[in-house]
Amino acid sequence: MSESQYRFHRLPEFDYSTPGAYFITVCTNGKRNYFWESVAALTAQPLAALPPYGCGVPLAGCERPLHRLPLTRYGRYAAEAIRDIPKFYSHASVDQSVVMPNHIHLLLRLDETPGQAGIPQIVRQMKAHVSKRAGFSIWQRSYYDHVIRGQKDYL
């Protein structure tokens, strides 16, 4: 997509360091399936032989109800970076997350700590951490967000 076609996905005039909940989706570059092992590579293994939900990382919401496929090393890097967000940003918590084949979903919550990093900085750091470990730029430019404004949005 050329610069002239690029759409900015943030709400204009909204302060993304405002306390609250945010639903974030970050896609891989070219929407390539970097995060789950290939179905073809696992056809010789019975489903019961695979680790539970393939996660290997104690991360709330990291499950694949339809496939139970293990994460690739890039998927593990993403899951670990998600898990570590509260270590780097004490005012942020990950309520739920899931690593999909070519994207991740996060339900991030920011508490009321003045002067702390907002969603853009947190997502930028997480993306940079995964790309550095992978050795290449794994993510597409930007990300999608939805500001959770009430209980209806949260469910």
Region spans (language model):
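Short catalytic/metal-binding and nucleic-acid-binding patches
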Residues: 1-155
